């Protein structure tokens, strides 16, 4: 009898999956949602797959996530490293419903490559899972990540490309093109949203450059290597980072190396992230008397909608300024 009831419950759950509310536009991570929701404003809904408080670096797909991918009219994802967990379900839907940012030709020359040699010296390390987000009991598959694949020259692409205003404008154009195909009756509104996005981003970028200009010589360390596009766009002087992969805390050799750099350079701040809280940052800050700040590369506190991408960049700028100005 129990077995019959169990099977009945499973059948009911499966039957209700297609009835779940779905967004016409689904972004893999929130920063992409900032871009898409700005262009889709008044046209269709936007949802973000990875929930607030979670990190895409260790996210496991749930059955409900797979259903969202299958039922969305448009899925926007990076296509590499950050959201590699989406590769399987996306391969099962119509490619016309997908924007794979890593495949956009105009973006390839703009990708930032960095050298990670001294962070791969056989150093001991430990996993730094310190964020607590809930998972459904059933997952489509386990973690499937390829953190910063390194080429023969020791260089790897930084896929946190949403921090590049230039790349984000290209993505916004691609989203506008897709939405225009899907909603030809909203062509004028989509064009207006795109124009508003570009204008607002330009205006906000000018303000951010002016805000951060006095801080351009202030050195700092970030928790993981996610901010190079932002730093390049707005002239900040990043001294280094604690780890390439935020799931792996730096080991003793790396910490010793960072401490030396803090002492040799004029480092003003060490930045942690809300998704991860490694003790090493607080420990180093106490021993070196360097300020601790917080950067959120996902923008959990920023609401989706018009101007949300510009607001996200401004929130990052404010976090930098708050710590580096001390």
Regions found by a protein language model. Give the residues of each.
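Extracytoplasmic metal-acquisition and chelation regions
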Residues: 23-326
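Gram-negative bacterial Sec-dependent N-terminal signal peptides
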Residues: 1-22
């Amino acid at each position: 009898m129990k077995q019959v009831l169990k099977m009945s419950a499973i059948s009911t759950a499966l039957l209700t999956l297609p009835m779940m509310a779905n967004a016409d536009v689904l972004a893999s991570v929130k920063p992409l949602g900032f871009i898409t929701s700005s262009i889709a404003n008044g046209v269709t809904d936007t949802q973000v797959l990875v929930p607030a408080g979670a990190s895409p670096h260790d996210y496991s797909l749930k059955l409900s996530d797979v259903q969202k991918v299958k039922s969305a009219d448009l899925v926007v994802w990076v296509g590499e490293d950050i959201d590699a967990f989406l590769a399987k379900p996306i391969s099962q839907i119509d490619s016309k419903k997908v924007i794979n940012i890593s495949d956009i030709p105009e973006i390839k020359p703009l990708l930032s490559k960095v050298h990670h040699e001294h962070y791969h010296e056989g150093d001991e390390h430990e996993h730094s899972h310190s964020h607590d987000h809930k998972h459904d009991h059933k997952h489509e598959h386990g973690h499937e990540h390829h953190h910063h694949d390194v080429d023969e020259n020791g260089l790897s692409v930084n896929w946190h490309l949403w921090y590049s205003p230039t790349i984000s404008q290209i993505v916004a154009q691609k989203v506008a093109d897709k939405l225009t195909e899907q909603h030809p009756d909203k062509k004028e509104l989509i064009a207006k949203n795109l124009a508003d996005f570009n204008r607002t981003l330009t205006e906000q970028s000018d303000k951010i450059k002016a805000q951060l200009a006095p801080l351009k010589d202030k050195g700092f360390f970030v928790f993981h290597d996610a901010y190079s596009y932002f730093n390049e766009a707005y002239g900040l002087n990043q001294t280094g980072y604690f780890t390439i992969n935020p799931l792996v805390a730096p080991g003793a050799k790396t910490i010793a190396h960072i401490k030396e750099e803090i002492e040799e350079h004029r480092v003003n701040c060490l930045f942690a992230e809300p998704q991860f809280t490694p003790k090493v940052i607080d420990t180093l800050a106490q021993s070196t008397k360097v300020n601790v700040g917080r950067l959120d590369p996902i923008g959990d506190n920023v609401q989706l909608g018009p101007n949300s991408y510009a607001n996200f960049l401004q929130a990052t700028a404010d976090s930098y300024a708050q710590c580096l100005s001390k």
